[in-house]
Curated annotation (Swiss-Prot):
Abolishes the inhibitory effect of tetracyclin on protein synthesis by a non-covalent modification of the ribosomes. One of its GO terms (biological process) is response to antibiotic. One of its GO terms (molecular function) is GTPase activity. Gene3D superfamilies: 3.30.230.10, 3.30.70.240, Elongation Factor G (Translational Gtpase), domain 3, P-loop containing nucleotide triphosphate hydrolases, Translation factors. It holds the Pfam family GTP_EFTU. It comes from Enterococcus faecalis. The lineage of its organism: Bacteria, Bacillati, Bacillota, Bacilli, Lactobacillales. Residues 1-242 form the tr-type G domain. Keywords: Antibiotic resistance, GTP-binding, Nucleotide-binding, Protein biosynthesis, Transposable element. GTP binds at residues 10-17, 74-78, 128-131. Belongs to the TRAFAC class translation factor GTPase superfamily. Classic translation factor GTPase family. TetM/TetO subfamily. The keyword GTP-binding applies. This is Tetracycline resistance protein TetM from transposon Tn916.
C-alpha cells in the first residue's frame, strides 16, 4: 500500500478543520462529520485551540482511498510555534495550502507559504468557501500571483451562478504556465508543433515536486463541493519520500506528547524498513530501545499495531526518545533542507498564583519543555525563582492558558526581558596554582581569553600536551570552561571569544579530572574579570510586506523602534522593506504594523546576530553551584 503524509495549512477561519473533516467523511474514514463548535472534530479539538482559532500542537489523523493511505498532519500556523511548524513540515510529502475565497491571501497565509518554500514541500493551493456570496475568483487569483507565486496552474473551471459548479479543465489553457516554464516545450509550441498530454503532465509533475509550480483547485468544505476531486488529487499527485523494497530501518522522532495520564508518547516518521512490535532498535547510533507498544492512525482513530512499514507515522510509548532522535540507520534520512531552530529571545519569571502548586507547576513545565525545545526553564537556587525562556508573546500566552486548562495551575508572569550575551573586551590571562590558598582542588589551570569578531562564537584550544595531561583531564577542563561560559560577569552566556588552556599541573595519584572540572570555571571567571566583558543584544533581520501607502510611515516610525531599513522595493501595489531591528523592539513594531495596516501586512524575521549594547548593563542572577560557589567567593574576595 502507498502511504503519503500531507499537511493542511491555512490562516484563521479559512476552514482547515472543516476541510480535514470533509476529507475523512468523503473517504469513508468517519461516518459523521465533527463539529468545530462542539469540539468533536478529529483535529483542533481542545478548548484552547478552539478559543484561539489556531493549531498549537501537531496532530495526526488519516484516511484510506483505494490503495493509498493518507496521514494528515495538522500543523501549527503561528510564528511563535515555528519550531513545531518546521518539525511537522519535515515529515510531509506534500501540503495543501487553504485560501478563503472571501478573505483571499492573508498575512498568515504568506508566512505559511514562506515556510513551505523554505522546506521544499510540494504544495497545492485550494480555494475554499467558493459558495459564499460576493466571491470574485479573478481577484483571488491575482492576489495569489502577487503575494505567493505567479507560477500557478488553475486546474478547474468554476461557475458560481446560478449554482456553484466545479469541473476539471480539458482544454489547453491550463498548460500555459507549464509551457512557458520550459524552453523546449515553448519552442515546440511557438513552431506550431503539437504537444502531447503526457509530456505536459510529466513537466508539470517535475516542477510540482521541485516546488516551482503550484496546481490550484477549488471547493467548499462545508458544502462538500470539490472534496472528492481533491481526494483524487492528493492520492495521485503526492509521492512518498521513502525507500522502497527491503532496507534497513530508519525513522525520525518529530513530536513528543504527554497524555492526560502522563504517558509520554513519541511520534515517528518511518522512512525505510519495517518496525515490529518487540523489536530492539538502535537510537541515533547509540543505545537501543525495545518496542513494547506501537500505535498508528487508522481511519481517524489511534489503533494498536504489531508492525509498521516505510512511510508510516507510528507512536511509541517511551521515556527516553527525544525530539529528532533517529531510529535505525541515520544515513537513510532524506536530505531535506535543514532548518535551524530559532533561539528563545525572551525570558520571564513565573510563579504559581497558589504557592502550594509550585511542584505541580514544575512538573508541568518539565513536560511542556520536553515537547517544545523553544521553552526552557531553570530554578534560581538562591531566590528560588522559576526563570522561563521562550520565543514570543503568543507562545507565552498559550503556555499560560495550557497550564490552566491541562494542568489546572494558574501563574503570575513578570514583564519579559531580552536574553543577552557577553563578549570579553580585551586579551587577558589568569592562573590558579595547586596548593595555593584558597584553591582547594588538586589542580593548576592557566587560561587566556581573546575577543573575536561578532558572530564567531566560542572557540577553544589547548596548548597543554596530551603527553603530560591525558585526555580525560583535558576533557574535564573543556567541560568546566563550557559550564563557566554559561554565566559571564553579568550572568549571561559568554560568546565571540577564544579561550586557550595554556598551563596545567597535577599531582599523581591524588589529582582527578573532577578537580580540573571544578577549577576551570573559577579560573575562567577570574580571567574574564581581568578582560572585562561587554553586553551583546540579539538583532533580527526583517522583511515587511505592506500596502504602498504605509511607506512614509514605515520610514518615520523606524527610529522609534531602533529599526534600520536597508532596502526598499515596490511591487504589485506593495512596499517590501528589509532591515534589522533589536529583538526587544520587534513585538511592539509588529503589533503597531498590524494595527496601522489593518492586518494587511506581514513581518518575517530571523535572528541576524548580536550587536554591542549601549547604556547601563543588564544583569541577571547567577545560577549557584554549591560545589564551587564558596571557592568563587574566596577568589572574588582577594581579587
Amino acid at each position: 500500500m502507498k502511504i503519503i503524509n500531507i499537511g493542511v495549512l491555512a490562516h484563521v477561519d479559512a476552514g482547515k478543520t472543516t476541510l480535514t473533516e470533509s476529507l475523512l467523511y468523503n473517504s469513508g474514514a468517519i461516518t459523521e462529520l465533527g463539529s468545530v463548535d462542539k469540539g468533536t472534530t478529529r483535529t483542533d479539538n481542545t478548548l484552547l485551540e478552539r478559543q484561539r482559532g489556531i493549531t498549537i500542537q501537531t496532530g495526526i489523523t488519516s484516511f484510506q482511498w483505494e490503495n493509498t493511505k493518507v496521514n494528515i498532519i495538522d500543523t501549527p500556523g503561528h510564528m511563535d510555534f515555528l519550531a513545531e511548524v518546521y518539525r511537522s513540515l519535515s515529515v510531509l510529502d506534500g501540503a495543501i495550502l487553504l485560501i478563503s475565497a472571501k478573505d483571499g491571501v492573508q498575512a498568515q497565509t504568506r508566512i505559511l507559504f514562506h515556510a513551505l518554500r523554505k522546506m521544499g514541500i510540494p504544495t497545492i493551493f485550494f480555494i475554499n468557501k467558493i459558495d459564499q456570496n460576493g466571491i470574485d475568483l479573478s481577484t483571488v487569483y491575482q492576489d495569489i500571483k502577487e503575494k505567493l507565486s505567479a507560477e500557478i496552474v488553475i486546474k478547474q473551471k468554476v461557475e458560481l451562478y446560478p449554482n456553484v459548479c466545479v469541473t476539471n479543465f480539458t482544454e489547453s489553457e491550463q498548460w500555459d504556465t507549464v509551457i512557458e516554464g520550459n524552453d523546449d516545450l515553448l519552442e515546440k509550441y511557438m513552431s506550431g508543433k503539437s504537444l502531447e498530454a503526457l509530456e505536459l503532465e510529466q513537466e508539470e509533475s517535475i516542477r510540482f515536486q521541485n516546488c516551482s509550480l503550484f496546481p490550484l483547485y477549488h471547493g467548499s468544505a462545508k458544502s462538500n463541493i470539490g472534496i472528492d476531486n481533491l481526494i483524487e488529487v492528493i492520492t495521485n499527485k503526492f509521492y512518498s519520500s521513502t525507500h522502497r523494497g527491503p532496507s534497513e530501518l530508519c525513522g525520525n522522532v518529530f513530536k513528543i506528547e504527554y497524555t492526560k495520564k502522563r504517558q509520554r508518547l513519541a511520534y515517528i516518521r518511518l522512512y525505510s524498513g519495517v518496525l515490529h512490535l518487540r523489536d530492539s532498535v538502535r537510537v541515533s547510533e547509540k543505545e537501543k530501545i525495545k518496542v513494547t507498544e506501537m500505535y498508528t492512525s487508522i481511519n481517524g482513530e489511534l489503533c494498536k499495531i504489531d508492525r509498521a512499514y516505510s512511510g508510516e507515522i507510528v507512536i511509541l510509548q517511551n521515556e527516553f526518545l527525544k525530539l529528532n532522535s533517529v531510529l535505525g540507520d541515520t544515513k537513510l534520512l532524506p536530505q531535506r533542507k535543514k532548518i535551524e531552530n530559532p533561539h528563545p529571545l525572551l525570558q520571564t519569571t513565573v510563579e504559581p498564583s497558589k504557592p502550594e502548586q509550585r511542584e505541580m507547576l514544575l512538573d508541568a513545565l518539565l513536560e511542556i519543555s520536553d515537547s517544545d525545545p523553544l521553552l526552557r526553564y531553570y530554578v534560581d537556587s538562591t531566590t528560588h525563582e522559576i526563570i522561563l525562556s521562550f520565543l514570543g508573546k503568543v507562545q507565552m500566552e498559550v503556555i499560560s492558558a495550557l497550564l490552566q486548562e491541562k494542568y489546572h495551575v494558574e501563574i503570575e508572569i513578570t514583564e519579559p526581558t531580552v536574553i543577552y550575551m557577553e563578549r570579553p573586551l580585551k586579551n587577558a590571562e589568569y592562573t590558579i596554582h595547586i596548593e595555593v590558598p584558597p584553591n582547594p582542588f588538586w589542580a593548576s589551570i592557566g587560561l587566556s581569553v581573546s575577543p573575536l569578531p561578532l558572530g564567531s562564537g566560542m572557540q577553544y584550544e589547548s596548548s597543554v600536551s596530551l603527553g603530560y595531561l591525558n585526555q580525560s583531564f583535558q576533557n574535564a577542563v573543556m567541560e568546566g570552561i563550557r559550564y563557566g561560559c554559561e554565566q559571564g560577569l553579568y550572568g549571561w552566556n559568554v560568546t565571540d571569544c577564544k579561550i586557550c588552556f595554556k598551563y596545567g599541573l597535577y599531582y599523581s595519584p591524588v589529582s582527578t579530572p573532577a578537580d580540573f572540572r571544578m577549577l576551570a570555571p573559577i579560573v575562567l571567571e577570574q580571567v574574564l574579570k581581568k578582560a572585562g566583558t561587554e553586553l551583546l543584544e540579539p538583532y533580527l533581520s526583517f522583511k515587511i510586506y505592506a500596502p504602498q501607502e504605509y511607506l512614509s510611515r514605515a520610514y518615520n516610525d523606524a527610529p522609534k523602534y531602533c529599526a534600520n531599513i536597508v532596502d526598499t522595493q515596490l511591487k504589485n501595489n506593495e512596499v517590501i522593506l528589509s532591515g534589522e531591528i533589536p529583538a526587544r523592539c520587534i513585538q511592539e513594531y509588529r503589533s503597531d504594523l498590524t494595527f496601522f495596516t489593518n492586518g494587511r501586512s506581514v513581518c518575517l524575521t530571523e535572528l541576524k546576530g548580536y550587536h554591542v549594547t549601549t547604556g547601563e548593563p543588564v544583569c541577571q542572577p547567577r545560577r549557584p553551584n554549591s560545589r564551587i560557589d564558596k571557592v568563587r567567593y574566596m577568589f572574588n574576595k582577594i581579587t
